[in-house]
Amino acid sequence: MSESDAERIALVTGGASGIGWAIAQGLAGEGCRVTIADRNTDAATARAAELGRPHAAHTVDVTEESTVAALFDRVGPLDIVVNTAGFSNFGRIIEMPVEEFRAVVDVCLNGAFIVAKYAGRQLRDGGSLVSVTSLNARLAAPGMSAYSAAKAGLAMLTQVAALEFAPRHIRVNAVSPGFVHTPLTQAVTQVPAVLDDYLENTPLGRLGAPTDVADAVLFLCSAKASWLTGEVLDLNGGAHLKRYPDILAHLDRMASV
């Protein structure tokens, strides 16, 4: 980021762990004042304390509009909003309870919509909204119907928001990571057969680190990306060029991780 980014006000949802935490650290390191918002109050508070003042923490459930509205009201005007909140489950379409499908969509898509709704109101002119989609938005992943559908929806939501927010020069983009070393991917990456299959189909031959994603988000939030909006940036070592691992073949082993 450039010096002009110093003292910008940033909000990171899902910022207490994994990719969200790496992004919060990166923004703080670039001189932004960061609010970490997460369902896990204790974790968010601990992370904000780790960053030190003037950074802050707030509790939020992105599926509950009232808590998102209260969060944005308390934080005030913003320059950057990064939405990373999400989770996944696994199962065959014909066996998955509708409630489990809805739960993933509620967080990963509906929650992202609610965050975007209030970000569009609260961001200053020239601000930046970045969401985290997934490789699943591009490659069909048997066994991950809910997550894949939600993340594909988020990719299109990003482009629609980019058009709607453009009159105020608010840029809306997303990053689309592949497998990254985080708690979210643990159920997949700790099954050797799945991990080997994934790496064999990843041209750069490695998993991502949270900082790989954070670095891309920092760029999208910076003045260097001032002419970039509506972009969904593939960030997966080239995995989107090949195929997704066969999750269904290893469901039993994944459930035990």
Sequence positions of predicted segments:
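Substrate-binding pocket helix/loop in short-chain dehydrogenase/reductase
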Residues: 92-93, 100-105, 198
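Active-site loop immediately N-terminal to the catalytic Tyr-X3-Lys motif
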Residues: 94, 139-145, 167, 205, ...
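Active-site helix of classical SDR
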Residues: 116, 150, 158
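Alpha-helical segment proximal to the catalytic Tyr-Lys
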Residues: 121-122, 163-167, 226
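Residue(s) in the substrate-gating loop at a strand-loop-helix junction
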Residues: 134
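C-terminal helical subdomain
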Residues: 174, 193-228, 235-237
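Short C-terminal tail/terminal secondary-structure segment
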Residues: 229-257
